């Protein structure tokens, strides 16, 4: 039964098979042998690459080309150099391979060897005559692309040995093209050969590489500006693709079709570099305007006949053949003239652009043709310098003389021979033609170069003479405006022309001779442009100039292109020692008085540039005329004048001290040590530590709290109305402590509180005036005082001499609450004066000393009496310091006691830092110890009848307390260093933890990647199995087909 079913199914299959596609196929498959035929050159390259020299020899015998290049232009020698196959390189060179064969990018085999760093191959190639000065398409020599030092050294030595000029090598192609273009122009016939692969012409190459001069000559020789290569690219496509703005401009000027498409439908805009797209759109607008205006004008297809010889003629680049024929003769003298210029330009600009030379030559030739036209005119002097400018500062008004009608220049067509050959030119004309480019090129340089202003000064007289004969066109005005902007034709009727400034003018050198022209031309408007580099020289000229030069210089309104310099501004007061207008008039070197024409400059002199603004801003905003005048004179006055001036200020401020306390402080400038920077005490900017130290040392505090001299006078008045033994009550002391405690946060109101406090004390003291004290207590008090003085006499003499001498010789102006003076200077009295909390007790103590000195005439005067009051001190040439400066510097409070000691500035500066120096530390302990002394003195100052006070013991206690405090300080310093160490360890630990976490993250990522790799490896292992399964299925399928075909038979 099963067999029957199987047969039935099989029969059904066979029925379906009949007539199927497989059944219609022949039973025997036609087996065609597939043959791949390679090009002989490709086989040759493969044989060379495999190193099979025998096969290479056989192929060479059969006629294979040893210099065959693949699609990239690589030859077998290139490939052998890349593969580092020295044997094959030697073999190929010996059998005649071209050693300097370039590939599509211009690389020769030496480029390849230098790039890969194969020193032995490079040495061999050089020994066989490989050129070290060959440049590739990007202008790079083998030295430029060498990376290893040994290779660079080898190539550099070879360059030096052969004397190769690299710059000349870079411009070799342009020079050859220029020579050929001139030859074609002279012969009137173009012998150009298209590139075998791309179909590119000389015009394509010149446009792509930006050879502007070659481009012009080729167009004049009769090249079609819309010529296409094999891909349909025009020269405009090439120039736009490689971003050559100058080439684009020249092609557009000559009315090339900007909408031509290549074989893939792209216009020049589609293939253009994105940086040049905007410029191309602008050129298209100009071309459309030009075409619309020239529709009805009948013109020659190549050279337009100009009706005027004006130097602003409409189409300048279209030169006559006569001018171009003369260029070979002019080349030699021009090159000689340009040699120093090239050196300067290389210094200023570094590596120049390839096309900079050609753009300079283009400027040259234009100027030549213009100057020729000018010299053939009647000598009508230009009235430019006398004309009144009415235009905006950006435009320059130029009036040009009219050319007589009988002197119209009509250039010949380029296809004809020139009627006047170069040899027949008169020597006078040759001289003139050589003169004009040299003088033009003399000024052709960037304004920012270092030597620009020197050039201006040397050529200024020559330029003035030239301006009377004719006006040269500015190098900075773009060519496009002169040829495409035909609105100029209307302006030519009025004999004026405004220079159009294009947004981007590439590779143009701004001529400094034009700056001279503008300076002479616009002397009425007095417009001078200067670069940021040349400003310093101008300032030196201003400084050293005589009266006449300074007058001329000042009447001109200076205009600068630098960011930091503005109209009539000085760059920075550091760089310009005395450049203000009033400064020049006050200098002793300047013999002539300043002219009235300097008004605008002196008006704007206080407006500094961005760098000098900090010091000069307060001056410009000063309301007081006296302050401004003093500022200007203090900037420039010499040292003697400065000391005299500061003395005057010291006397004046002493007289007006009381008025200044009530009024808001006027800004009084202080003279800096250099004498160049004018700073005010209210300047908000934070100076450095040196500046702060300098300023503090020169400022005299007018009145912060009550001055020492005023306090002395007040205490004398109080002593006249009461006895010296009269005490101060406990309530007085408590009130004084409260007042001083409150005065800490409220420093500006401390003066008023102290005055009230003193008045209250005087009233109380007058009430107690009637009270009598026992005479025996007074005598006892004096005896104790004398005992104390004798016990401390030895220590006092040693320590008091130095401070007293230093106090008379130095005048430090800031006083701090902790002064570095010994305890025994004036006994315990000076200890009291160190603490501002004990000011009342200190004044009381001084009064008692005064009475005691009055009774005992034999006692020497105390150091306090030897000090001069502030008003009687002699001025040291420093101006007084106002109250505002103390408010601006709350870090350094000036206490009531003036600093009479010769304390160094560093000590004063560091007095706020308890750990800075040991002297400041001891000052802190002495000020702290004064509290303990105050507490121990309080019962005695209330005149209780306690005669058991032992001053020596007190002194020893104070010393012991000081030692304890010093020990505590050492302990705290040690603790601080320990804490710092712990902090550093903690930070290092944190960093380590961070590093660890980072490492863990990396490890995790690595594990994940490794897992992925292992999974992929597993899949790769499965791949052969899958392939085997696939093959098996294919085989089974083939077997089934064969079985079916057999069964069908």
Curated annotation (Swiss-Prot):
Keywords: ANK repeat, Cytoplasm, Repeat. This is Protein phosphatase 1 regulatory subunit 12A. InterPro entries: Ankyrin_rpt, Ankyrin_rpt-contain_sf, MYPT1/MYPT2/Mbs85, PP1_Regulatory_Subunit, PRKG1_interact. The gene is ppp1r12a. GO terms for cellular component: A band; cytoplasm; PTW/PP1 phosphatase complex; Z disc. Regulates myosin phosphatase activity. Transmembrane segments: none annotated. ANK repeats lie at residues 39-68, 72-101, 105-134, 138-164, 198-227, 231-260. Coiled coil: none annotated. Residues 319-341, 426-436, 485-497, 649-664, 702-711, 747-789, 835-863, 890-906, 934-947 have a biased composition (Basic and acidic residues). Residues 303-315, 545-564, 593-607, 820-829 have a biased composition (Polar residues). The keyword Transport does not apply.
């Amino acid at each position: 039964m099963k067999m029957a079913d199987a047969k039935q199914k099989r029969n059904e299959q066979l029925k379906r098979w009949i007539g199927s596609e497989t059944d219609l196929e022949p039973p025997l498959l036609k087996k065609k042998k597939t043959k791949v035929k390679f090009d002989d050159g490709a086989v040759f390259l493969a044989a060379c690459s495999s190193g099979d020299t025998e096969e290479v020899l056989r192929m060479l015998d059969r006629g294979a080309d040893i210099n065959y290049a693949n699609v990239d232009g690589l030859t077998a020698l290139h490939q052998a150099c890349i593969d580092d196959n020295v044997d094959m390189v030697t073999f190929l060179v010996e059998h005649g391979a071209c050693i300097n064969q370039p590939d599509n990018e211009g690389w020769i085999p030496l480029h390849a060897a230098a790039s890969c760093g194969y020193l032995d191959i490079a040495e061999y190639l050089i020994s066989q005559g490989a050129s070290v000065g060959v440049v590739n398409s990007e202008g790079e020599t083998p030295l430029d692309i060498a990376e290893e030092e040994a290779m660079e050294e080898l190539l550099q030595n070879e360059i030096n040995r052969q004397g190769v000029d690299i710059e000349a090598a870079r411009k070799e192609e342009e020079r050859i093209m220029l020579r050929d273009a001139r030859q074609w122009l002279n012969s009137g016939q173009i012998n150009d050969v298209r590139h075998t692969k791309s179909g590119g012409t000389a015009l394509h190459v010149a446009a792509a590489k930006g050879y502007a001069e070659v481009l012009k000559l080729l167009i004049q020789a009769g090249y079609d500006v819309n010529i296409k290569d094999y891909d349909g690219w025009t020269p405009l496509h090439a120039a736009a693709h490689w971003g050559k703005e100058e080439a684009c401009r020249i092609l557009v000027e000559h009315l090339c079709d900007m909408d031509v498409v290549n074989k893939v439908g792209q216009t020049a805009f589609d293939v253009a570099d994105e940086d040049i797209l905007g410029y191309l759109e602008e050129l298209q607008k100009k071309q459309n305007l030009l075409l619309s205006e020239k529709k009805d004008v009948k013109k020659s297809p190549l050279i337009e006949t100009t009706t005027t010889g004006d130097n602003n003629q409409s189409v300048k680049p279209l030169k006559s053949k006569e001018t171009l024929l003369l260029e070979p003769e002019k080349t030699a003298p021009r090159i000689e003239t340009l040699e120093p210029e090239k050196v300067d330009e290389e210094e200023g600009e570094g590596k120049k652009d390839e096309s900079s030379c050609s753009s300079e030559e283009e400027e040259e030739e234009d100027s030549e043709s213009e100057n020729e036209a000018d010299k053939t005119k009647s000598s009508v002097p230009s009235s430019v310098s006398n004309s009144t400018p009415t235009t905006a500062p950006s435009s320059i008004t130029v009036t040009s003389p009219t050319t007589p009608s009988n002197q119209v220049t009509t250039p010949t067509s380029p296809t004809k021979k020139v009627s006047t050959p170069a040899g027949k030119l008169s020597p006078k004309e040759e001289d003139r033609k050589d003169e004009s480019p040299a003088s033009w090129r003399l000024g052709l340089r960037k304004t920012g170069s270092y030597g620009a202003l020197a050039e201006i000064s040397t050529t200024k007289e020559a330029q003035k003479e030239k301006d009377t004969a004719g006006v040269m066109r500015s190098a900075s005005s773009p060519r496009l405006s002169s040829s495409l902007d035909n609105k100029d034709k209307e302006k030519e009727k009025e004999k004026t022309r405004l220079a159009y400034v294009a947004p981007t003018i590439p590779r143009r050198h701004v001529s400094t001779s034009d700056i001279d022209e503008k300076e002479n031309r616009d002397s009425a408007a007095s417009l001078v442009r200067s670069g940021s580099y040349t400003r310093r020289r101008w300032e030196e000229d201003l400084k050293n100039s005589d009266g006449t030069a300074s007058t001329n210089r000042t009447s001109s309104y200076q205009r600068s292109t630098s960011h930091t310099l503005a109209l009539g501004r000085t760059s920075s007061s550091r760089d310009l020692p005395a450049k203000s207008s009033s400064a020049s008039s006050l200098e002793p070197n300047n013999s002539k008085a300043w002219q009235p024409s300097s008004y605008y400059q002196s008006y704007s002199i206080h407006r500094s540039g961005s760098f000098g603004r900090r010091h000069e801003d307060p001056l410009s905003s000063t309301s007081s005329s006296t302050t401004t005048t003093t500022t200007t004179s203090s900037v420039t006055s010499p040292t003697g004048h400065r000391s005299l001036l500061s003395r005057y200020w010291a006397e004046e401020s002493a007289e007006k001290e009381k008025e200044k306390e009530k009024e808001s402080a006027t800004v009084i400038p202080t003279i800096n040590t250099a004498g160049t920077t004018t700073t005010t005490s209210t300047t908000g900017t934070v100076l450095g530590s040196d500046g702060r130290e300098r300023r503090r040392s020169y400022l005299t505090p007018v009145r912060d709290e009550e001055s020492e001299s005023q306090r002395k006078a007040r205490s004398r008045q109080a002593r006249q109305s009461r006895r010296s033994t009269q005490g101060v009550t406990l309530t007085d002391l408590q009130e004084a402590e409260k007042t001083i405690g409150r005065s800490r946060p409220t420093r500006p109101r401390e003066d008023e509180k102290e005055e009230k406090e003193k008045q209250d004390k005087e009233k109380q003291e007058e009430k107690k005036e009637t009270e009598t004290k026992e005479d025996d207590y007074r005598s006892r008090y004096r005896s104790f005082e004398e005992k104390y003085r004798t016990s401390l006499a030895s220590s006092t003499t040693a320590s008091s001499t130095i401070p007293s001498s230093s106090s008379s010789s130095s005048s430090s102006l800031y006083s701090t609450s902790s002064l570095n003076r010994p305890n025994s200077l004036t006994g315990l009295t000076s200890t009291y004066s160190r603490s501002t909390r004990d000011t009342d007790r200190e004044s009381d103590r001084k009064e008692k000393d005064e009475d005691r000195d009055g009774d005992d005439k034999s006692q020497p005067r105390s150091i306090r009496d030897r000090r001069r009051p502030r008003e009687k001190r002699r001025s040291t040439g420093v101006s007084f310091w106002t109250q505002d400066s103390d408010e601006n510097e709350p870090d350094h409070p000036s206490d009531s006691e003036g600093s009479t000691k010769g304390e160094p500035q560093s000590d004063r500066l560091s007095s706020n830092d308890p750990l800075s120096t040991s002297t400041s530390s001891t000052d802190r302990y002495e000020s702290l110890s004064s509290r303990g002394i105050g507490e121990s003195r309080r019962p005695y100052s209330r005149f209780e009848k306690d005669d058991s006070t032992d001053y020596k013991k007190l002194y020893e206690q104070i010393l012991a307390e000081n030692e304890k405090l010093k020990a505590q300080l050492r302990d705290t310093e040690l603790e601080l260093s320990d804490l710092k160490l712990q902090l550093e360890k903690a930070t290092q630990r944190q960093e380590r933890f961070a590093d660890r976490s980072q490492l863990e993250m990396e490890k995790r990522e690595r594990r994940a990647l490794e897992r992925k790799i292992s999974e992929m490896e597993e899949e790769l292992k499965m791949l052969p199995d899958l392939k085997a399964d696939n093959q098996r299925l294919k085989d089974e399928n083939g077997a089934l087909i064969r079985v079916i075909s057999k069964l069908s038979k």
